[in-house]
Design a protein with these regions (language model features):
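Conserved NTP-donor binding/palm subdomain of two-metal-ion nucleotidyltransferases/polymerases, i.e.
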Residues: 1-61, 67-323
């Protein structure tokens, strides 16, 4: 594969980065194998070995992977920290932090290695992970040869892109290429899983975003969903934001803070997650505010209650006005 005159100047740099990431992943697999741990590639590194395997033109900054258990994750972290890695946050291996975050981030100590996110479940977002039923467990069970099943992979990637407001074009491209590779039966299975695992809004938003970016042929797939009144309102809300969010803008900062809420399918789940936001567990509170000592929670609990209560009301008003 050689660059052509029509390809952007960054093409060779992207390919070099891609090859470095692939080489790093093979090294990590070898390290994991020496301690009897199986890892499952996620996101970019997974796609580089599947739909982008021939072109290698998908930018990847770091490596996301999944361990099948918390114990395997701890063992792999210990192994990699003996080599060229260190924990991004020293508290991330505490039981309460693992329960809240569901992943551990490792930073590279050398320029020839890339940063790593080691998941213990596929979906780690604090609200999504609690509202998708048994998806995480079922998706792991359906893995074949340490790879996620295709429709599970699409839903996983869609929720990640939705969480980040579809702000990067590469995520939409990933979803489109995966959809193009699906048979009609797989598309039907995808719709069934979206209903089963409460991924309806995520799926609707992803397909709607693809349609708005020129993939009009997917309108038929969108029409396969019998939209409720609240789902139509949700799509209007999502469609009202077409610019990249800028966290320096107060409104954008507010929307991004609560964006995940809008994608939760069931009203009772949204209310349950709101209660958790108002009254977080010690692990979640520690993760949000990077609390270093247990005593500091006495200050952060009332602070969180005031801030979360005020901003959630503002978000609710904004959602109503925008939809």
């Amino acid at each position: 594969m050689t660059p052509t005159e029509n390809q952007p100047p960054s093409y060779e740099a992207n390919i070099a980065r891609t090859l470095l990431v692939l080489d790093n992943f093979e090294w990590i697999k070898q390290q994991a194998a020496t301690i009897g741990v199986h890892i499952i590639p996620l996101k970019g590194i997974d796609l580089l070995q599947s739909i982008y395997a021939e072109r290698l033109d998908r930018p990847v900054r770091d490596i996301d992977m999944l361990c099948r258990s918390e114990e395997d994750c701890r063992r792999l972290v210990e192994r990699l920290c003996q080599e060229d890695y260190r924990l991004a946050f020293q508290f991330s291996l505490r039981p309460e932090a693992m329960a809240a975050k569901h992943k551990v981030t490792l930073l590279s100590c050398t320029p020839n290695k890339v940063n790593i996110d080691i998941h213990i479940v596929p979906v780690t977002k604090k609200f999504f992970s609690q509202t998708i039923g048994s998806f995480n467990e079922d998706a792991i069970q359906r893995c074949v040869e340490d790879r996620m099943e295709a429709t599970d992979r699409w839903l996983f990637l869609a929720q990640h892109a939705a969480f980040h407001a579809f702000s990067d074009g590469k995520w939409l491209r990933d979803l489109q290429l995966l959809l193009d590779s699906f048979t009609q039966e797989q598309r039907s299975v995808l719709c069934e899983k979206a209903n089963t695992y409460n991924f309806r809004r995520v799926t609707l938003a992803a397909i709607s975003s693809l349609v708005s970016h020129g993939e009009a042929r997917l309108q038929q797939l969108l029409s396969a969903f019998d939209l409720s009144r609240s789902e139509k309102r949700f799509l209007r809300f999502m469609g009202s934001f077409r610019h990249p969010f800028d966290r320096r803008r107060p409104l954008d900062r507010l929307i991004t803070s609560y964006w995940e809420f809008a994608f939760i399918d069931r009203r009772r789940d949204r209310f349950r997650m709101w209660l958790q936001l108002m009254f977080p567990s010690p692990g979640v509170l520690t993760n949000i505010y990077r609390i270093r000592t247990p005593l500091a929670r006495l200050f952060y609990y009332p602070l969180n209650f005031i801030v979360s209560g005020f901003t959630s009301v503002l978000f609710g008003i904004t959602y109503f006005l925008k939809s």
